[in-house]
């Protein structure tokens, strides 16, 4: 579950708030609101998603195992012990060429960054992912949370999640996912641009 404190930035008495929760292990949410308008989303663990927690060791090449059952196509990692933002790996950074050499930040509109200080220039595998020795991602005093995503099908072979990319143009672009998505997150990787989110609840 999740508890909101009384700080204005997190729980304003008469404000509207949106919450997206990937509760991969339990699958429940207890939420109390007082005169507020609140939207909440939860994903019980299934195909294409995994949550990993780990403690850093300040050693470049530190490997972290996961249980995704596939090669992660996107990863978000957050140092829970500091104010560092979320660092993002995506299989299509740099046009899909050596994407492990690049990263994005969820808390930033900046373009992709070429730097081995995050993923140690090492691609993730179906068993784990590799980190540099930077404090943002692998401090010996830091405790971290990693969200891992991969394209996946249900038991009948129907697609249920998709991690991908597309090239923009000056005209309308149709992006085919193979199913009707209910949650879409977009970020321009090659240049400055805000993260854009669409979901079926708000239209």
Q: Predicted segment positions?
A:
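Surface-exposed molecular-recognition determinants
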Residues: 1-203
């Amino acid at each position: 579950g999740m508890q909101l404190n009384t700080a204005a930035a997190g729980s304003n008495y008469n404000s509207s708030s949106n919450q997206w929760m990937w509760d991969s292990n339990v699958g429940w949410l207890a939420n109390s609101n007082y005169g507020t308008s609140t939207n909440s989303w939860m994903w019980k663990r299934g195909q294409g998603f995994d949550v990993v927690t780990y403690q850093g060791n300040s050693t470049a090449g530190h490997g972290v195992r996961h249980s995704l059952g596939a090669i992660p196509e996107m990863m978000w990692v957050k140092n829970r012990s500091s104010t560092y933002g979320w660092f993002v790996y995506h299989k299509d950074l740099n046009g899909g060429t050596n994407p492990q050499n690049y990263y994005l930040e969820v808390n930033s509109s900046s373009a992709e960054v070429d730097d081995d200080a995050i993923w140690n220039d090492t691609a993730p595998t179906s068993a784990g992912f590799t980190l540099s020795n930077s404090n943002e991602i692998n401090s010996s005093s830091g405790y971290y949370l990693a969200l891992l995503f991969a394209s996946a099908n249900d038991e009948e072979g129907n697609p249920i999640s998709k991690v991908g990319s597309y090239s923009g143009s000056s005209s309308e672009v149709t992006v085919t996912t193979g199913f009707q998505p209910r949650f879409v997150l977009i970020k321009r990787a090659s240049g400055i641009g805000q993260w854009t989110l669409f979901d079926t609840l708000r239209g």
